[in-house]
Amino acid sequence: MDRQMLIKEAIQAREGAYVPYSRFQVGAALLMKDGSVIRGANIENASYGLTNCAERTALFKAYSEGRRDVVAIAVVADTKRPVPPCGACRQVMAELCPADTKVYLGNLQGDIQEITVSELLPGAFTAEDMND
């Protein structure tokens, strides 16, 4: 699957967003090693701190189903520039994905930025930092 197809999956994932407060729909799509796709959307809460971003929704869904073979991630929102992940999502990606995992950031105008997980969060705190 090419990056454009994965971006389309993320655009479709936006439709599952629960955003009654901000109306800011974000979709994410994970490409798995076997070629399958796992989607996620952002889910808001009246207590904003409990909101879950699309990237984390997709990753937690994959992991909860025993799927840990992420090859690429696409994230899309209706923004002027390709939508950047928040700090929490960057940390979760650094924990759950290989450092060289491709991340495609996009918007509805078709702009795409390609980056890797390690480039999103240089010097990430990981499990290796906890081992002696």
Swiss-Prot record:
Substrate binds at residues 42-44. One of its GO terms (molecular function) is zinc ion binding. It comes from Halalkalibacterium halodurans (strain ATCC BAA-125 / DSM 18197 / FERM 7344 / JCM 9153 / C-125) (Bacillus halodurans). It holds the Pfam family dCMP_cyt_deam_1. The keyword Hydrolase applies. Its EC number is 3.5.4.5. Zn(2+) binds at residues 53, 86, 89. Belongs to the cytidine and deoxycytidylate deaminase family. It comes from the Bacteria. This enzyme scavenges exogenous and endogenous cytidine and 2'-deoxycytidine for UMP synthesis. This is Cytidine deaminase.
